Amino acid sequence: GALTIACAKGNPQGEMVGIDRWGKEYASFNKSLCESNAAAEEVKNTCFLSGNAVLLDFPDESFDAVTSNYVYHNIARADKQALLMETLRVLKKGGVFAIHDLMSPTRYGNMQMFVERLKEQGYEQVELIDTTKGMFMSPKEAKWLMLRGSALIVGKK
């Protein structure tokens, strides 16, 4: 809920939708907690829904922007590039994306090839940014925090 709330605060004219799968190992996080946090921040332009990133329950091109922060590496047995494509499916033409995760080759495969494939499909300004080289942390911090492979993929559909 924190990313949704931060986006809502920074974009008060828009409606922010936060998607999560609560329960099981994430039992301490739930929809009502997200809603309470939004209320505490006096943010009204949010909506929190339970969902599955593997198959998003939204029509194609539903959103102006999509974001995710350290989520997909937690989804076991899922093809991470397929998860990214499912996320991009719900992004409107002209919409922007920023997805931050542990994008090591063992988890995500060849992300440089993925970036090139997106560009071939017409996506613009696509960049894969290594966030362990001073953007958010140093390489030493990334190793210590077990965040090797941390990267941000951004672009425009």
Segments from the language model and where they lie:
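Core SAM-dependent methyltransferase catalytic element
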Residues: 119-124, 135-157
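Helix-to-beta-strand junctions that scaffold the AdoMet/dcAdoMet cofactor pocket
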Residues: 11, 75-77, 91-93
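Conserved SAM-binding strand-loop segment of SAM-dependent methyltransferases
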Residues: 42-53
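A short glycine-rich, Lys/Arg-flanked "PGG" loop and its adjoining helix->strand segment in the class I
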Residues: 81-93
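Conserved SAM-binding loop of SAM-dependent methyltransferases across substrates and taxa
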Residues: 2-12
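Conserved class I S-adenosyl-L-methionine
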Residues: 24, 98-120
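A short acidic, Gly/Pro-enriched loop at the edge of an enzyme's catalytic core
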Residues: 51-66
